C-alpha cells in the first residue's frame, strides 16, 4: 500500500499522529507538523511533540506566519487537526477583489489556506460539538460557512459527534469529527451512487468505524442545500445540524443518530495503584471540593443594584470509580467544580498526570518533563487517541480502493 502523507496542524502533544501511527496497516506518514501556543515563552506541547516524534518537519511558529510557498512545498495527501470553535462570520472586502475574508485570527481560515496550497485527498478535523450549533444567535451558521467553503473547494464532508465512552473508552468526551474527501476520488464516486441516509447509517466512514442504530432518535432528520455564497450564509443562514451528517455536492442530510454502545472502561480501571501522597488532599481542599460540587443558591447584586439568585445543582460528592471519567478540561490542575475529585480507599485525591494521559489513551508519562500544571493542560486540550486509530483504519480501506474495484464496489 502507498503511504498517505499527512500534515498535522495545531498538533498539541501529538494525539492525531499517535492515533494514525497505531493503525492496522501503518501507512500514515506525518511529513509536517505545526504547534504554536501564543503568549508562552516555553512551548511545552511542541517540546513534547518533538521529543516523542523524530521524523518529519516540526514547525513551532504561528500558522499565520507560515508562507503559502512553505505550505505548497509540503507533502500532503491528508490534513488533520483539532482547532478551536471561534467566530466564523465573514464579510466581502470593500473592493471585492480579495473575495471572502474570514475574521482575523480564526484558525479555520488557516486550514483553508493550507488546503488551497496543497489540495489533499482527505481532511480529518476535530472540534467541540457546540460547533454545530454556534453561534447561539444564528444556529448552525458557523458550520454552514465551513461546509460551503469546503464544497466550493471540491470536497464532500461527513461528520459525527462521538462520545469516546460510547465506544469503549474511559472518558465521556464528546467531540465532532469532520472527514472531508475530494469529489474525484473513487470513494466519492462510490458514495455518489449511495443514498445519503445509507452513507450515514451503513457505508460511510463513521458508520463503519463507529456503528449506530439504523433509525433516527425521535425522528430528528433535517435536509438542506448549501450555496457557495458564504457571505449570504454568514448573514442569513440558520439550520439545525444533528450529531451525524453528510454534505455531498452541496446537498446536506443530518440525522440525530444513536450509538451502538460498547462497554466502556471505568475510571476505577485506569487509576494507579500506588500514588504519591502529593496528590492527596488536605481537609481544607476536601471541604472546598465538596462545596463547589454541592447545590447552591447565592444572592448576588449587579452593578446597577439589581438583586438576583445564582442557582447551581449538585453533583455526586466524588467521581464514581464505576463509570467512565467526565470530560477533562484544561483547568484539571486547579480546585474547581469540573476537576475530578476521587475517593480511593478512603483517601481523597485528584487525578495524577498518568491517569489523565490514560483517559485520553496516551502511553504513561507521555507528557513527562513539563510542569505538572502543563501536563494537565495538555491533556485537557488533547483528543482520545483510540478514536483516531479507528478512523484511520477506515481511511486506509478507503485509500486502497482501486479503479478496477470501483465498478463492483460494495464498501468494506
From Swiss-Prot:
SUPFAM superfamilies: S-adenosyl-L-methionine-dependent methyltransferases (SSF53335). One of its GO terms (biological process) is DNA restriction-modification system. Its EC number is 2.1.1.37. Disulfide bonds: none annotated. Gene3D superfamilies: DNA Methylase, subunit A, domain 2, Vaccinia Virus protein VP39. Pfam families: DNA_methylase. One of its GO terms (molecular function) is DNA (cytosine-5-)-methyltransferase activity. The keyword rRNA-binding does not apply. It is an enzyme of class 2 (transferase). Residues 4-402 form the SAM-dependent MTase C5-type domain. It catalyses: a 2'-deoxycytidine in DNA + S-adenosyl-L-methionine = a 5-methyl-2'-deoxycytidine in DNA + S-adenosyl-L-homocysteine + H(+). Keywords: DNA-binding, Methyltransferase, Restriction system, S-adenosyl-L-methionine, Transferase. The active site is at residue 85. NCBIfam families: dcm. Belongs to the class I-like SAM-binding methyltransferase superfamily. C5-methyltransferase family. This is Type II methyltransferase M.Sau3AI. It comes from Staphylococcus aureus. The gene is sau3AIM.
Amino acid at each position: 500500500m502507498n503511504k498517505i502523507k499527512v500534515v498535522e496542524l495545531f498538533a498539541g502533544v501529538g494525539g492525531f499522529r499517535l492515533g494514525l501511527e497505531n493503525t492496522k496497516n501503518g501507512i500514515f506518514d506525518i511529513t509536517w507538523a505545526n504547534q504554536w501556543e501564543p503568549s508562552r515563552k516555553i512551548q511545552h506541547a511542541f517540546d513534547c511533540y518533538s521529543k516523542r516524534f523524530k521524523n518529519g518537519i516540526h514547525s513551532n511558529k504561528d500558522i499565520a506566519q507560515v508562507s503559502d510557498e512553505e505550505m505548497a512545498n509540503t507533502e500532503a495527501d491528508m490534513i488533520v487537526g483539532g482547532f478551536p470553535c471561534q467566530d466564523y462570520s465573514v464579510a466581502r472586502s470593500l473592493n471585492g477583489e480579495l473575495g471572502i475574508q474570514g475574521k482575523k485570527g480564526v484558525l479555520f481560515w488557516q486550514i483553508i489556506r493550507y488546503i488551497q496550497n496543497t489540495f489533499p485527498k482527505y481532511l480529518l478535523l476535530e472540534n467541540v460539538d457546540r460547533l454545530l450549533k454556534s453561534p447561539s444567535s444564528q444556529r448552525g451558521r458557523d458550520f454552514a460557512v465551513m461546509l460551503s467553503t469546503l464544497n466550493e473547494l471540491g470536497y464532500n464532508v461527513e461528520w459525527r459527534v462521538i462520545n469516546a465512552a460510547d465506544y469503549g473508552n474511559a472518558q465521556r468526551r464528546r467531540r465532532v469529527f469532520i472527514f472531508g474527501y475530494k469529489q474525484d476520488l473513487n470513494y466519492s464516486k462510490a458514495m455518489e451512487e449511495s443514498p445519503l441516509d445509507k452513507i450515514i447509517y451503513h457505508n460511510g466512514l463513521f458508520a463503519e468505524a463507529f456503528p449506530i442504530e439504523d433509525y433516527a432518535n425521535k425522528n430528528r432528520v433535517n435536509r438542506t442545500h448549501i450555496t457557495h455564497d458564504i457571505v449570504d450564509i454568514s448573514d442569513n443562514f440558520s439550520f439545525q445540524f444533528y450529531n451525524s451528517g453528510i454534505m455531498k455536492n452541496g446537498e446536506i442530510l443530518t440525522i440525530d443518530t444513536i450509538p451502538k454502545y460498547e462497554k466502556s472502561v471505568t475510571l476505577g480501571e485506569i487509576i494507579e495503584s500506588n500514588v504519591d501522597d502529593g496528590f492527596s488532599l488536605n481537609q481544607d481542599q476536601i471541604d472546598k471540593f465538596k462545596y463547589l460540587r454541592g447545590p447552591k443558591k447565592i444572592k448576588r447584586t449587579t452593578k446597577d443594584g439589581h438583586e438576583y439568585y445564582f442557582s447551581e445543582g449538585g453533583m455526586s460528592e466524588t467521581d464514581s470509580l464505576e463509570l467512565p471519567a467526565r470530560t477533562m478540561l484544561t483547568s484539571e490542575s486547579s480546585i474547581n467544580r469540573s476537576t475530578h475529585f476521587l475517593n480511593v480507599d478512603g483517601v481523597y485525591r485528584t487525578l495524577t498526570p498518568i491517569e489523565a494521559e490514560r483517559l485520553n489513551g496516551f502511553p504513561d508519562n507521555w507528557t513527562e518533563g513539563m510542569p505538572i500544571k502543563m501536563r494537565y493542560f495538555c491533556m485537557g486540550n488533547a483528543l482520545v487517541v483510540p478514536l483516531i486509530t479507528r478512523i484511520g483504519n477506515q481511511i486506509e480501506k478507503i485509500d486502497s480502493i482501486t479503479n478496477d474495484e470501483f465498478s463492483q464496489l460494495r464498501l468494506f
